[in-house]
């Protein structure tokens, strides 16, 4: 409203000046400077009587209609960049706040069993000190699926998987998603799972993987973030594979030392 009143006052004064000097050329009026004016925003409505009587004024008004900056694109880009930086900072703050506010969900016993079955294992209970589950190596292997990963295992092997939520150290597990069984004499392939095959394991420890650095950068936004991540892992020891005929181990009889010494003596005498 202030700019509108100012413009009306200027138009009124201009009419008095132009009425006295009507014989001036159009080029002489381009040098007139209007002091004490500050037109910043808003649309200005010119005086109709002035534009009707002075046709050159409309042409001069159109030529003077411009923004008070060297380039309109510069201001737009600066505003967009500042808004982008603010948005990035807000996103980073929201991410940190959400990480701090994260709360572990409580599962019921039935939900724990269902979740474990979807991953591919079943908790059989804690390992007792009197139990002897670890056996010597047997020439049998199996391919099991735990979560989204597959492992080729034999008894006595140790594997690292993504952390299994519902088991503790020294718990006995039964891996139910067996995809393949094999030995020296036969191979059994599941479609996709072998229902009668099981692989037994024991939880040895819950550990953390090596730190992975994650660097994020956005061009022209002055946005740089470096974060570290350590994946939680579970170490399993395979104890037994069931569902396939195991070949009998070949027993190799070693000759006694007395027989070896007698044989060497006979060779020397001969």
UniProtKB/Swiss-Prot annotation:
Tell me the superkingdom of the source.
Eukaryota
Entry comment describing in which tissues the protein is expressed: Constitutively expressed in roots, stems, leaves, flowers, pistils and siliques.
Primary location: mitochondrion
Cellular component terms, GO, for this chain's entry? mitochondrion; plasma membrane; ribonucleoprotein complex; ribosome
Is-annotated flag, keyword Ribonucleoprotein? yes
Phenotype reported upon loss of the gene:
Failure of fusion of the polar nuclei during megagametogenesis and abnormal double fertilization; fails to undergo fusion of the outer nuclear membranes.
Gene Ontology biological process terms, A to Z: double fertilization forming a zygote and endosperm; embryo sac development; karyogamy; polar nucleus fusion; pollen development; translation
Transit peptide start and end? 1-68
Q: List the biased-composition ranges (Basic and acidic residues).
A: 102-113
Q: Which PROSITE patterns does the record match to this protein?
A: RIBOSOMAL_L21 (PS01169)
Q: Which UniProt keywords apply?
A: Developmental protein, Fertilization, Karyogamy, Mitochondrion, Ribonucleoprotein, Ribosomal protein, RNA-binding, rRNA-binding, Transit peptide
Name any one Pfam family assigned in the record: Ribosomal_L21p
Among InterPro entries, the record links this protein to: bL21-like (IPR028909), bL21-like_sf (IPR036164), Ribosomal_bL21 (IPR001787), Ribosomal_bL21_CS (IPR018258)
- Under the GO molecular function aspect, what terms does this record hold? rRNA binding; structural constituent of ribosome; transcription cis-regulatory region binding
Q: Which PANTHER family match?
A: 50S RIBOSOMAL PROTEIN L21 (PTHR21349), LARGE RIBOSOMAL SUBUNIT PROTEIN BL21M (PTHR21349:SF0)
Protein family (similarity comment): Belongs to the bacterial ribosomal protein bL21 family.
- Spell out the subunit comment: Component of the mitochondrial ribosome large subunit.
What's this chain's function? This protein binds to 23S ribosomal RNA in the presence of protein L20. Required for karyogamy during female gametophyte development, when the two polar nuclei fuse to form the diploid central cell nucleus, and during double fertilization of the egg cell and the central cell.
Protein's name in the database:
Large ribosomal subunit protein bL21m
Species of origin: Arabidopsis thaliana (Mouse-ear cress)
